[in-house]
């Protein structure tokens, strides 16, 4: 399995011949190494509706006829206002099998909206974390979230091989809470810090996160680099 990081919270993987992207914030993301106008994907998975996660979803979905997997509210928004053909609505606690693997959404503590052309926030359902079961590996993408103790429950139910976790602070966990989550609750084999350095408000030194983590291995990835299993 190819599993790579592409700036902010965007991850991409290929499994069983399918190409999948999570939170495709490409255009306007100074960290991204991808080109939304040429990227080919079969599936798009969204943790929530904020612009730095929703990103290029509409273009990618319509050009590729890709299936968008996300909250029911996000699905309704895409089909009603943007003519996206293929949507799979899900919600927290729900698990579904796809031809690339299994997807389960779990809790995240954040918010979820998108600002329309009139500057009005549109509610897009609950923010969610994401459990992926792919080719014998369990991947936990926490989404944007603060620290919460049920991360331990999530990891108890789904022992984690790779955890993508935000460290940017201000809008999500910072390094102190993220490292606590890894050390005390999630305890993955591999931790990958995300959601930092994209904007001034979330500038962080990922090496401080690495120094604070005492469980498993921390892999600090540059955009375009693969997780090393």
UniProtKB/Swiss-Prot annotation:
Family assignment from sequence similarity: Belongs to the UPF0173 family.
GO MF annotation, one: hydrolase activity
Full protein name: UPF0173 metal-dependent hydrolase SSP1060
Alphabetical list of InterPro entries matching this protein: Metallo-B-lactamas, RibonucZ/Hydroxyglut_hydro, UPF0173, UPF0173_UPF0282_UlaG_hydrolase
Pfam families found in the cross-reference section: Lactamase_B_2
HAMAP family reported in the protein's UniProt record: UPF0173 (MF_00457)
SUPFAM superfamilies: Metallo-hydrolase/oxidoreductase
UniProt superkingdom: Bacteria
Keywords from the UniProt entry: Hydrolase
């Amino acid at each position: 399995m190819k599993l790579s990081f592409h700036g902010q919270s965007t991850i991409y993987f290929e499994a069983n011949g399918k190409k999948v992207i999570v939170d495709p914030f490409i255009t306007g993301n100074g960290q991204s190494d991808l080109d939304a106008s040429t990227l080919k994907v079969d599936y798009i998975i969204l943790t929530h509706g904020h612009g730095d996660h929703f990103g290029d979803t509409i273009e990618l979905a319509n050009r590729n006829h890709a299936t968008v997997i996300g909250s029911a509210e996000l699905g309704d928004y895409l089909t009603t206002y943007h003519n996206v053909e293929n949507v799979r609505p899900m919600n927290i606690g729900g698990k579904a099998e796809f031809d690339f693997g299994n997807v389960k959404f779990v809790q995240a503590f954040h918010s979820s909206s998108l600002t329309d052309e009139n500057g009005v926030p549109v509610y897009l359902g609950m923010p969610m974390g994401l459990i992926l079961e792919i080719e014998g590996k369990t991947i936990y993408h926490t989404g944007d979230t603060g620290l919460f103790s049920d991360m331990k429950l999530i990891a108890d139910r789904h022992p984690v091989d790779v955890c993508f976790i935000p460290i940017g602070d201000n809008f999500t966990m910072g390094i102190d809470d993220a490292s606590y989550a890894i050390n005390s609750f999630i305890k993955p084999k591999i931790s990958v810090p995300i959601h930092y350095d994209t904007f001034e408000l979330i500038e962080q030194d990922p090496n401080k996160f690495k120094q604070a983590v005492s469980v498993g291995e921390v892999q600090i990835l540059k955009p375009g680099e693969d997780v090393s299993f």
